[in-house]
A protein has these predicted regions:
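Short, low-complexity, charged amphipathic interaction modules
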Residues: 1-48, 53
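Collagenous Gly-X-Y triple-helix signature in extracellular proteins
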Residues: 43-263
Length: 263
């Protein structure tokens, strides 16, 4: 099965089996994307066009010498209001510096997603890692701001609707991909569970890099493949949709959560 992505009229693809072909295609893809971009965000070597009106909170005068504690306190007090596309810097407890992007806003909270990919793992290991990430890597001020989020998915991708509550979670396929992409890939699970987020309508916002080498990598989604319990959808390194066995260990775990807005 060949999968690929077009940039400026050029198609970059690989056969899904050859690791060297994957590496060559990934490098060529990044060179093409880099050539089309003019701005590089902090925190990751992935380049991406900065959306109009997007704000890097750390570069505003009030927070240049501040930290995540100041940002969380001002959000709580209503001094700071975030918009979709804004970026919030954070230093994890192990010293790693990451960036969280605002991908959605609702009545009660802001949805933040980590731009970087910290660790690759099997889909079956994600929940255990999420628990560790929440308990051990998040600064206290950020951890205290996170609110439980109801997540819904269809059993085996197209079966009974299941509800769970989570502090850290992975996006659903229906939040990332469009109806047209579901039409073209009938194996995608969780169709209709959510609407596609505006943030993900630009495929460049789906590209994420690993901390280890700064290169784009595939990342897991919550959704199982339609009709299956052991295969899961993912975002490929080029921003398109793909899938893999739940035991594959070279896909990364995304980090997504919601923080409370000021009352």
């Amino acid at each position: 099965m060949k999968i690929g992505m077009m940039v400026n009229g050029n198609i970059f693809s690989y056969d899904g089996e050859s690791s060297q072909a994957f590496e060559d295609s990934r490098n060529a893809f990044m060179e093409a994307v880099t050539a089309t971009q003019t701005t590089q965000d902090s925190g990751c070597s992935c380049t991406r066009e900065v959306l109009k009106n997007r704000v890097d909170v750390s570069r505003t005068k009030r927070y240049i010498n501040g930290c995540i504690d100041d940002i969380m306190q001002d959000i709580k007090d209503g001094v700071l209001t975030l918009n979709i596309g804004d970026v919030v810097p954070c230093e994890l407890t192990d010293g790693q510096k990451v960036v969280f992007e605002v991908t959605d806003i609702d009545e009660n909270g802001y949805r933040l997603e980590m731009k970087e990919l910290l660790k690759t793992m099997a889909h079956t290991d994600m929940q255990k890692w999420y628990d560790t990430f929440y308990k051990s890597l998040l600064p206290t001020s950020l951890k205290n701001a996170i609110i439980p989020t109801k997540r819904e998915y269809k059993k085996d991708g197209d079966g009974k609707l299941v509800e769970v509550y989570a502090m850290i979670f992975a996006p659903s396929a229906s939040e990332v991909f469009s109806e047209e992409e579901f039409d073209d890939n009938d194996w995608l699970g969780d169709r209709g569970v959510y609407e596609q987020l505006d943030f993900y309508k630009d495929w460049r916002n789906r590209i994420r890099c690993t901390v280890e080498d700064g290169k784009p990598n595939a990342w897991w989604l919550l959704s199982a493949i339609a009709g299956h319990s052991t295969g899961f959808a993912l975002v490929a390194y080029y921003g398109g949709c793909s899938y893999s066995s739940a035991t594959a260990t070279w896909r990364a775990a995304p980090v997504c959560f919601r923080i409370r807005k000021s009352k």
